[in-house]
Amino acid sequence: MSLDLSKKVVTVRPDQTIVTKQNLPYYLGISTKTAGTLGLSMNLVVIPPGASPKAHYHKDFETAIYLLKGRVETRFGENLKESVINEEGDFIFIPQGVPHKPVNLSDSESALAIISRNDPSEHENVVHYEP
């Protein structure tokens, strides 16, 4: 990669939310649309108390998650038979093509996470999974 003095640093304030295919509220962060990225996205996701979004998998990208707040069980694999429980401060990696479904284990507090993916337009490459 060569030096490029024509590009600028971009700041994105996460003040716009969307509801994703997984039925979760996302605060839009870094993506092709917001920052002109070529191979990266990063958003803030909120899982409401007791909520569990639709099971899904990511067709062509990997996902890295940092759990800021809460306790979340992620069910994954064939028929979602496997699971892992993560707590505040954990990093989570989900390979492409792995079906999964997070569950907020709290009935009173939202779980918050930063989600980064190696796809700048990742919402278009999410596929629902029916176990």
Residue ranges and their predicted role:
Residues 87-88, 96-123:
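Ligand-binding loop in jelly-roll beta-barrel domains
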Residues 43-59, 96:
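Conserved short histidine dyad/triad with adjacent acidic residue
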Residues 35-38, 47-51, 69-73, 119-122:
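Short, charged/polar surface micro-motifs in flexible loops or helix N-caps
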Residues 1-39, 54, 128-131:
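A short, N-terminal "cap"/entry segment at the start of jelly-roll beta-barrel domains
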Residues 44, 57, 76-78, 104, ...:
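Residue-level recognition of conserved beta-strand positions in structured domain cores
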Residues 35, 60, 79, 107-108:
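Short strand-connecting beta-turns/loops that link adjacent beta-strands
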Residues 52, 61-88:
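A short beta-strand-loop-beta hairpin characteristic of the jelly-roll/cupin
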